[in-house]
């Protein structure tokens, strides 16, 4: 729906009488004023005219109107999107006979033939108006003609209707559809229903009328009558919301440093320098109260907040954090590395601002010395500079201490070149903390595995040894069996046979169907974005030095029918690869060319290539060690899911999931992902979920949500929500 060309009128109305409003959009522009080729010719024309000393003697040659008539012009079809009943909208303009090509602007709906469905009248520029008769059959409706006080048209009056358990409301407003006025009737589609449960008219003066004896499949007249009008009843007190944002005395605010990734990598799909902040919860001063650490961007120190007995969080200044503020904190784990009874800190450093191999990509380990004194140990962990994000903790070898999986997020300035991930085995002894990189011995496949964003330790086969799951951007979900702590074997093909690649951002586990094993929820980009993908039409990226200038270039592509095309246009593509301007002299020739015609089959075959086959966020149900995928509910697909929290929110014995996300820093030609306010996925205990909207749950998380953690505040359960370049949000769960 985001690409409806030059749109004018937009009408929401129930054209198929199923009780759900559809959307009709007129579009078209007489001259293509945004045509880049004409714009370039235009500059040449006016420069020639400006610099011609004999301009006044060449009026015919420089006749402006004649020149402007050369501006391209193309008639286009309008759009009718059918409401899929809380599952989005589907374009039906061809199927429903509305594929005439026109220059359209004004549009109205009205039941012109009084047969119970809405017809369309469309105004077309320099052409006859179009009248479309609606031939819907086997559906029911009810209509109302409202007569207000003193025989006036009661603009602003609302009609509330309940039928077969479904609620609808419409407000009488005539000015609709771009400089147009629709019929003064109010029209409700009823689908198969023939029984009305309740009709209430809320007049524009605030009074109400309850309507009885109205007839289905006809138009009913309702007249404002002082004798039948009663005042609105006072609203009952709203039910306590499950989620409630609480005020903070000294909230953490993430302060993203200014850096433009697109200066070096013009064709990136999104920034890779804005992936924070990290967030972790733990008791860092051994007072039995949860504290938290929030990661800083470059130039912002890591922030430690200690919980007081009254539930207030106080920021504590840690000198070593101030000293290390020029690292970017993208992953944090709080755990006792040396079994001395206090909590240490591991921080994964990341970002995209510096060259590969820079020391600012070295991870950091801070040993807890007690009394909130932390010291950085450069000998505790390998000083390998990899831009990371994900860290997960597990005693994979059951030797009594905690080991680490550390995910490589990216190779700076070489997107999407794969990064290496690591397994660090804890070899601490006698109070001396030491982690050894055992990736080569335990799981060599982690070398250059991809752009890792998330991991999870799960006992997949019930042998009591926790196995490793890894996922990321442009990756499939990878499953690695723990062979009794000795090493790991990939079992992806055995446990997830319908696996597909995505932009995975988070994995969480839980027994969502109450059958005794562990299921999974995975967050993906979602289905409400410019980029779309399927197995038949994958979304791809290619990496190569396409123009042979000793720098890597990337090309994003999509499939239309059986042909592959570049996502980005001539202008952006030529900024990265200037040779494109020489090969394609104008925008039209580039727009008409396939990917192979632009870059050649040979160089594409030689390129590093990844593809995505689905952007759906999914639930993976465990059936005796084999996972099957189910799409999460529609409202969980409206934006990407960056963070997932699993718990029984309402105490009904079934696990639920709280999901948050958004992606604000997309490339300039792609609107940002910002449709999520967070969603409570209420579990039914059978592997199903119902998405509860903010107005039902009270869960409202505006912004670019990056991380969420549960934290105990006195005797209450709260949710911490960390957002990029925004203040941390604290939400009480009632």
Please place each PLM-identified region on the residue numbering:
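Acidic/hydrophobic-patterned starts of short beta strands in beta-sheet-rich repeat architectures
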Residues: 18-26, 114-123, 286-296, 339-348, ...
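Gly/Ser/Thr/Pro-enriched helix-cap/hinge segments flanking short amphipathic alpha-helices
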Residues: 66-79, 83-278, 487, 527-538, ...
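Short, conserved, GDST-rich strand-edge loop motifs in beta-rich repeat architectures
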Residues: 29-72, 348-360, 407-419, 523-537, ...
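Beta-propeller blade repeat segments, especially FG-GAP/WD-type strand-to-loop junctions
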Residues: 36-41, 77-90, 129-139, 301-316, ...
């Amino acid at each position: 729906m985001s690409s409806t060309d030059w749109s004018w009128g937009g009408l929401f109305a129930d054209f198929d009488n199923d009780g759900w409003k559809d959307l009709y959009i007129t579009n078209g522009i007489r001259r293509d004023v945004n045509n880049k080729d004409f714009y370039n010719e235009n500059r040449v024309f006016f420069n020639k005219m400006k610099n011609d000393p004999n301009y006044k003697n060449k009026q015919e040659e420089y006749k402006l109107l004649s020149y402007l008539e050369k501006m391209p012009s193309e008639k286009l079809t309008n759009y009718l999107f059918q409401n899929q009943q809380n599952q989005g909208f589907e374009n039906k303009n061809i199927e429903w006979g509305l594929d005439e090509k026109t220059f359209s602007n004004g549009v109205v709906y009205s039941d012109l033939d009084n047969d119970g469905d809405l017809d369309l009248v469309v105004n077309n520029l320099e052409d006859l108006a179009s009248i479309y008769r609606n031939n819907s059959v086997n559906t029911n409706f009810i209509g109302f003609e409202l007569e207000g006080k003193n025989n006036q048209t009661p603009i602003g009056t609302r009609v509330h209707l309940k039928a077969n358990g479904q609620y609808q409301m419409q407000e009488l407003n005539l000015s609709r559809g771009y400089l147009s006025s629709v019929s003064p009737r109010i029209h409700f589609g009823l689908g198969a229903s023939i029984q009305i449960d309740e009709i209430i008219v809320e007049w524009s003066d605030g009074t109400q009328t309850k309507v009885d004896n109205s007839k289905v499949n006809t138009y009913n007249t309702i007249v404002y009558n002082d004798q039948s009008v009663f005042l609105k009843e006072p609203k009952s007190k709203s039910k306590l919301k499950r989620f409630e944002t609480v005020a903070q005395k000294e909230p953490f605010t993430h302060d993203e440093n200014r850096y433009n990734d697109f200066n070096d990598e013009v064709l990136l799909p999104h920034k890779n320098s804005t992936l924070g902040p990290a967030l972790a919860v733990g008791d860092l001063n051994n007072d039995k109260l949860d504290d938290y650490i929030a990661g800083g961007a470059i130039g912002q120190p890591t922030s430690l907040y200690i919980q007081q007995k009254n539930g207030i969080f106080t920021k504590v200044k840690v000198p070593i954090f101030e000293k290390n503020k020029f690292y970017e904190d993208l992953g944090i784990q709080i755990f006792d590395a040396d079994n001395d009874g206090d909590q240490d800190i591991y921080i994964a450093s990341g970002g995209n601002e510096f060259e590969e191999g820079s020391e600012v990509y070295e991870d950091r380990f801070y040993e807890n010395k007690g009394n909130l004194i932390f010291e950085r140990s450069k000998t505790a962990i390998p000083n390998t500079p990899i831009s990371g994000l994900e860290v997960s903790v597990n005693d994979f070898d059951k030797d009594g201490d905690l080991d680490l999986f550390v995910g490589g997020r990216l190779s700076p300035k070489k997107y999407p070149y794969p990064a290496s991930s690591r397994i660090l085995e804890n070899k601490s002894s006698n109070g001396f903390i030491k982690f050894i990189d055992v990736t080569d011995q335990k799981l060599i496949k982690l070398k250059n595995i991809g752009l890792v964003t998330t991991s999870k330790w799960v006992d997949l086969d019930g042998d009591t040894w926790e196995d490793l799951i890894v996922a990321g951007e442009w990756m499939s979900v990878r499953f690695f069996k723990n062979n009794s702590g000795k090493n790991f074997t990939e079992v992806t093909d055995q446990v997830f046979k319908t696996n597909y690649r995505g932009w995975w951002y988070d994995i969480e586990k839980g027994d969502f169907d109450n059958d005794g094993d562990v299921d999974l929820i995975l967050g993906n980009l979602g289905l409400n974005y410019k980029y779309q993908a399927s197995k038949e039409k994958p979304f791809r990226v290619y990496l190569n030095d396409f123009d042979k200038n000793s720098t890597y270039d990337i090309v994003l592509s999509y499939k239309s029918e059986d042909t592959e095309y570049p996502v980005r246009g001539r202008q952006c593509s030529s900024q990265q690869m200037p040779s494109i301007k020489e090969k394609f002299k104008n925008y039209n020739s580039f727009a008409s060319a396939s990917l192979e015609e632009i870059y050649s089959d040979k160089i594409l075959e030689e390129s590093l290539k990844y593809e995505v086959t689905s952007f759906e966020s999914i639930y993976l149900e465990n059936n005796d060690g084999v996972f099957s995928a189910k799409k999460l509910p529609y409202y969980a697909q409206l934006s990407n899911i960056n963070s997932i929290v699993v718990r029984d929110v309402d105490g009904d014995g079934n696990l639920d999931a709280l999901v948050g996300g958004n992606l604000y820093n997309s490339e300039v030609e792609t609107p940002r992902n910002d449709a999520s306010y967070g969603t409570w996925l209420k579990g039914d205990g059978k592997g199903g979920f119902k998405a509860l909207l903010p107005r039902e749950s009270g869960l409202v998380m505006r912004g670019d949500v990056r991380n969420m953690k549960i934290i105990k505040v006195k005797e209450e359960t709260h949710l911490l929500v960390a957002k990029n370049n925004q203040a941390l949000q604290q939400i009480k769960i009632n």
